[in-house]
Curated annotation (Swiss-Prot):
This is Hemoglobin subunit delta. The keyword Phosphoprotein applies. Heme b binds at H64, H93. SUPFAM superfamilies: Globin-like. Belongs to the globin family. Heterotetramer of two delta chains and two alpha chains. GO terms for cellular component: blood microparticle; haptoglobin-hemoglobin complex; hemoglobin complex. Gene3D superfamilies: Globins. The keyword Nucleotide-binding does not apply. The gene is HBD. It comes from Colobus polykomos (Western black-and-white colobus monkey). It comes from the Eukaryota. Residues 3-147 form the Globin domain.
Length: 147
């Protein structure tokens, strides 16, 4: 559960309505893989991840980034029940994929950077504060099934 004020909910929804999920998802996941290269071990089947240019241009990275942000969009529609919304994804990432839950926090912070880059002055400190709450809540929900 994420505790947002009505004003925070408004700014999150307003900005998210302008987000190009395809582009932002690919950029966020790509940046995660470049900035934190140890996360690439979960994506070995994606092919060439040998350089920043290869990662950022990789169609599988872009496609998976779109998928990740699609799930994030679902979470935005269910801010009061994030653990339930992400229960199956948490179980998958914990039990089958064995993803370090810290990676969820890293990806959330990268997403905030990408949003700031894409929206410039529109991404005010108020908007950032609201999004930091959201990505922290999503990361916590995704880590919920970990023992």
């Amino acid at each position: 559960m994420v505790h947002l004020t009505p004003e925070e909910k408004t700014v999150v929804s307003a900005l998210w309505g302008k987000v190009n999920v395809d582009a932002v998802g690919g950029e966020a996941l790509g940046r995660l893989l470049v900035v934190y290269p140890w996360t690439q071990r979960f994506f070995e089947s994606f092919g060439d991840l040998s350089s920043p240019a290869a990662v950022m241009g990789n169609p599988k990275v872009k496609a998976h980034g779109k998928k990740v942000l699609g799930a994030f969009s679902d979470g935005l529609a269910h801010l009061d029940s994030l653990k339930g919304t992400f229960s199956q994804l948490s179980e998958l990432h914990c039990d089958k994929l064995h993803v370090d839950p810290e990676n969820f926090r890293l990806l959330g912070n990268v997403l905030v950077c990408v949003l700031a880059h894409n929206f410039g002055k529109e991404f005010t400190p108020q908007v950032q504060a609201a999004y930091q709450k959201v990505v922290a809540g999503v990361a916590n929900a995704l880590a919920h099934k970990y023992h």
